[in-house]
């Protein structure tokens, strides 16, 4: 197996020059650089990733901790992050918590041992103790979406409160006064903020919030299906339902369809996230748009910026994205 000394000898340069060419740590004349790369190719030399990381203090790797990569919302973000990592010459370690808080500790320990250059966090389960452990390593972290505030981490906020308000306001503007909710767990920041936006819009319109129309679950189609069936057992029903994710909306629409009830003529449905498949629902889903690819790319760019600069001079920043209403055909206008 060829060594760096073999490459240096064939190229007629020092091993230090070979190292600078490979790691791009110093300017090397074009002819010299070409001679080095020709020697590398001829000898089929593959530098040790571990040795290179120790030499230049980087592993060219990023860790990403998320709730689950199976959900369409997360999957679209992961795809954008992974593609951008590839374009920037980084590899990605993807860690799923599956809503299990204890998993984050193991993931953090693993990422520290892997000597990742930085970490993206997109889950609500991490604890203050976990953050303090990680902050002690000086590894940069960007908290995406609904994570807890931290003095050492950058944050990207999606303004779920604003999105909840927009969704409810749209239903009200279309003449709906009896509005229900199928949410995720309201103890979670994401659901709590969307619910608070819902409450604000309802209170501004002087509309009552009926607790028997408020259902909690998770962000899966099965939850939307189950909670819609529970709702349909009531004597008095709302004319519209605000589902806290498009996947919840899919389950809710399916439950109505199984009973021969159509959307939106029988009941209007509005979703949240604008996942790729939502436009292909039957009917196409009116929803709240979040730019998943933009969120992922922005988070990674901030992290890469932090990796490259002096950590003692960096001030953590907070970036906000604002949701938008996407009009399709799942909300009936009762004003007509």
Swiss-Prot record:
GO molecular function, one term: DNA-binding transcription factor activity
Keyword Transcription found: yes
Biological process annotations from GO: negative regulation of DNA-templated transcription; purine nucleotide biosynthetic process
Annotated keywords: DNA-binding, Purine biosynthesis, Repressor, Transcription, Transcription regulation
Pathway: Purine metabolism; purine nucleotide biosynthesis [regulation]
Superkingdom as given in the UniProt entry: Bacteria
SMART domains: HTH_LACI
UniProt binding sites for hypoxanthine: 73, 188, 219, 273
InterPro entries, per the entry: HTH_LacI (IPR000843), Lambda_DNA-bd_dom_sf (IPR010982), Peripla_BP/Lac1_sug-bd_dom (IPR001761), Peripla_BP_I (IPR028082), Tscrpt_reg_HTH_PurR (IPR023588)
Domains as described in the record: Consists of two structural and functional domains: an N-terminal DNA-binding domain, approximately the first 60 residues, and a larger C-terminal domain, approximately 280 residues, which imparts the function of corepressor binding and oligomerization.
SUBUNIT field: Homodimer.
Function, in words: Is the main repressor of the genes involved in the de novo synthesis of purine nucleotides, regulating purB, purC, purEK, purF, purHD, purL, purMN and guaBA expression. PurR is allosterically activated to bind its cognate DNA by binding the purine corepressors, hypoxanthine or guanine, thereby effecting transcription repression.
Protein name, as recorded: HTH-type transcriptional repressor PurR
Species per Swiss-Prot/TrEMBL record: Actinobacillus pleuropneumoniae serotype 5b (strain L20)
UniProt gene name: purR
């Amino acid at each position: 197996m060829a060594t760096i000394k073999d490459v240096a000898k064939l190229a007629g340069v020092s091993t230090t020059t070979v190292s600078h060419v490979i790691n791009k740590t110093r300017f090397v004349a074009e002819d010299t650089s070409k001679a080095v790369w020709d020697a590398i190719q001829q000898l089929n030399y593959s530098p040790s990733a571990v040795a290179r990381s120790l030499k230049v203090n980087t592993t060219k790797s990023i860790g990403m901790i998320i709730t689950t990569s199976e959900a369409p919302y997360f999957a679209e973000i992961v795809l954008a992050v992974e593609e951008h990592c590839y374009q920037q010459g980084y590899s990605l370690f993807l860690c799923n918590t599956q809503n299990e808080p204890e998993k984050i500790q193991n993931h953090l320990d693993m990422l520290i041992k892997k000597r990742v250059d930085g970490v993206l966090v997109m889950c609500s389960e991490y604890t203050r103790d976990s953050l303090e452990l990680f902050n002690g390593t000086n590894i940069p972290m960007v908290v995406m979406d609904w994570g807890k505030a931290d003095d050492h981490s950058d944050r990207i906020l999606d303004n779920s409160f604003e999105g909840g308000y927009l969704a409810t306001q749209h239903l009200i503007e279309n003449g709906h006064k009896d509005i229900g909710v199928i949410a995720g767990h309201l103890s979670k920041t994401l659901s709590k903020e969307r619910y608070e936006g819902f409450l604000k819009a309802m209170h501004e319109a002087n509309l009552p919030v009926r607790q028997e129309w408020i259902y909690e679950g998770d962000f899966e189609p099965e939850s939307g299906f189950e909670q819609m069936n529970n709702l349909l057992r009531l004597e008095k029903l709302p004319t519209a339902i605000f589902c806290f994710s498009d996947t919840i909306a899919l389950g809710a629409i399916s439950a109505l369809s199984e009973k021969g009830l159509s959307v939106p003529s029988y009941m209007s449905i509005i979703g949240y996230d604008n996942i790729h498949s939502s436009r292909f629902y039957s009917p196409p889903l009116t929803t709240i748009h979040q730019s998943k690819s933009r969120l992922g790319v922005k988070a990674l760019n901030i992290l890469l910026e932090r990796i490259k600069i002096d950590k003692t001079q960096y001030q953590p920043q907070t970036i906000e994205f604002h949701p938008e209403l996407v009009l399709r055909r799942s909300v009936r206008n009762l004003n007509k």
